[in-house]
Amino acid sequence: MSREEVFEKLNEVFRDVFDDDSITVGETTTAEDIEDWDSLEHINLLAAVEQEFGIKFNMGQVVSMKNVGEMSDIIISQIN
């Protein structure tokens, strides 16, 4: 799966989790960029991403993610 395809799927997941069709995430998107992205929604988001891509994040990966670009790096490393 290409990086573009990962971001297409991530956009769908973010829109579903935050119930906002206007969201478009990019490499540098962080929780500060999305109004409703709090700690509870972060857990929901991670679970939805794991389900969408058929992966599991470990605690070290979760802690190291600083933005959506880093999330996509981890996803790509697990699916390719």
PLM-predicted stretches and their roles:
Residues 2-37, 41-47, 51-80:
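Phosphopantetheine-dependent thiolation modules in NRPS/PKS and related acyl-activating systems
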